[in-house]
Amino acid sequence: MITDVQLAIFSNVLGVFLFLLVVAYHYINANTGKIGPKAK
């Protein structure tokens, strides 16, 4: 059975991963919007 400590570690790792994924998505989305019109 999974313990409380294992569940806490798993949820923290998952939360950090999702947060970094959202930050990376916004960073890429913002940069591609600025680079696109300049290239044309």
UniProtKB/Swiss-Prot annotation:
Subcellular location as annotated: Endoplasmic reticulum membrane
Keyword Repeat among UniProt keywords: no
Membrane topology field: Single-pass type III membrane protein
Listed GO CC annotations: oligosaccharyltransferase complex
Record Pfam families: Ost4
Keywords: Endoplasmic reticulum, Membrane, Signal-anchor, Transmembrane, Transmembrane helix
Transmembrane segments: 5-25
Ranges in coiled-coil conformation: none
Regions of this protein lying in the Cytoplasmic compartment: 26-40
The keyword Plastid appears for this protein: no
Source organism, top-level taxon: Eukaryota
Lumenal-facing ranges: 1-4
UniProt-listed GO biological process terms: protein N-linked glycosylation; protein N-linked glycosylation via asparagine
Similarity section: Belongs to the OST4 family.
Subunit-structure text: Component of the oligosaccharyltransferase (OST) complex.
PANTHER family: DOLICHYL-DIPHOSPHOOLIGOSACCHARIDE--PROTEIN GLYCOSYLTRANSFERASE SUBUNIT 4 (PTHR48164:SF1)
Function: Subunit of the oligosaccharyl transferase (OST) complex that catalyzes the initial transfer of a defined glycan (Glc(3)Man(9)GlcNAc(2) in eukaryotes) from the lipid carrier dolichol-pyrophosphate to an asparagine residue within an Asn-X-Ser/Thr consensus motif in nascent polypeptide chains, the first step in protein N-glycosylation. N-glycosylation occurs cotranslationally and the complex associates with the Sec61 complex at the channel-forming translocon complex that mediates protein translocation across the endoplasmic reticulum (ER). All subunits are required for a maximal enzyme activity.
Name of the protein described by the UniProt record: Dolichyl-diphosphooligosaccharide--protein glycosyltransferase subunit 4
Species: Drosophila willistoni
Phylogenetic lineage: Eukaryota, Metazoa, Ecdysozoa, Arthropoda, Hexapoda
